[in-house]
UniProtKB/Swiss-Prot annotation:
GO terms for biological process: ubiquinone biosynthetic process. It catalyses: a 4-hydroxy-3-methoxy-5-(all-trans-polyprenyl)benzoate + H(+) = a 2-methoxy-6-(all-trans-polyprenyl)phenol + CO2. Keywords: Lyase, Membrane, Metal-binding, Mitochondrion, Mitochondrion inner membrane, Transit peptide, Ubiquinone biosynthesis, Zinc. HAMAP family: Coq4. It comes from the Eukaryota. It is a peripheral membrane protein. Its cofactor is Zn(2+). This is Ubiquinone biosynthesis protein COQ4 homolog, mitochondrial. Belongs to the COQ4 family. Disulfide bonds: none annotated. InterPro entries: Coq4, Coq4_euk.
Length: 282
């Protein structure tokens, strides 16, 4: 009983902190005639002038919420408990990813800067939603292409690329874009791995993503999500899915460096071979 009360107290504190920071952010953005000047990037370098910023950076700096170290700790602890209590709280899961993933995001950013394809992603900062991706055109592609595989996966699972939350609790635009890219390409990882969006599929993909990206929230989702599997699912998970996920996560190439949108026309089998992906046997 004490543990339960403590958990809900922590969750309520997180909600209050979220509401307070959102109110503060809204007020700061509407009062006065100048924009806030406290936005500092990595190594305390000043932000570039607005005219030099890309659209993602402008939008991120308008909407981000600055938090102190104490507030970040509260958000991290509270969101982790809330996500465990109710895995459907995508806002809490998103908050957890942003407040615990800085080190992993920095490593991903460093890797992306080291490859030609990754550099192109970081320069162009593509977004994935129904305004930027022509889903109807993908439907008309040959069935063996990655583009067709992706859109069929989205339709079969009745999901949309427009459902991803904005990044708000990171303080550096580069890291914010990496987190945004992770969220927006999550469905593409499902598609390339041929994993459904049910609980078993999500837990399996989270293991692959955890080992591939190092993001703490992925490890948390993989470990604690498994406890929510039904008995039969848990048996299949331990016997087939978990060993495959661990093997796959350790052997495949870094997926965050893949410019998926430039691979629409590529043969999906060829793409999987390039990334060292072997599908789970039926």
């Amino acid at each position: 009983m004490f543990v339960r009360k403590s958990c809900y107290s922590l969750i309520n504190a997180t909600r209050r902190c979220l509401r307070y920071r959102q109110l503060s952010s809204t007020t700061a953005g509407t009062v006065g005639t100048t924009a806030p000047t406290a936005n500092i990037s990595l190594n305390d370098e000043p932000q570039p002038a607005a005219a030099e910023m890309d659209e993602f950076t402008k939008e991120f700096l308008r909407n981000r919420i600055e938090v102190s170290d104490i507030q970040r700790l509260i958000l991290s602890a509270g969101s982790s408990v809330a996500a465990l209590v109710d895995p459907r709280r995508h806002d809490m899961i998103a908050c957890l990813g942003e407040t615990t993933g800085r080190e992993a995001l920095e490593k991903i950013l460093h890797y992306m800067r080291s490859t030609e394809e990754g550099q192109r992603i970081l320069v162009e900062k593509p977004r994935i939603n129904t305004r930027t991706v022509d889903m109807e055109a993908l439907k008309k592609m040959p069935e063996h292409t990655f583009g067709y595989t992706y859109v069929k996966f989205m339709e079969d699972n009745n999901i949309t690329p427009d459902s991803r939350m904005e990044v708000r609790f990171l303080d550096e635009p580069g890291l914010a874009y990496v987190m945004t890219r992770y969220r927006e390409t999550h469905d593409m990882v499902h598609a390339i791995l041929d994993m459904p969006t049910n609980m078993l599929g999500e837990v399996t993909v989270k293991w692959v993503e955890a080992l591939n990206t190092g993001l703490p929230m992925c490890y948390g989702g993989a470990v604690f999500g498994a406890f929510r599997l039904r008995t039969k699912q848990r048996q299949n998970y331990l016997r087939k899915y978990l060993p495959w996920a661990l093997r796959t996560g350790n052997r495949i190439k870094p997926l965050m460096g893949v410019y998926w949108e430039k691979r629409w026309e590529q043969d999906v089998t060829e793409l999987r071979k390039e990334l060292n992906i072997e599908l789970l046997a039926p």
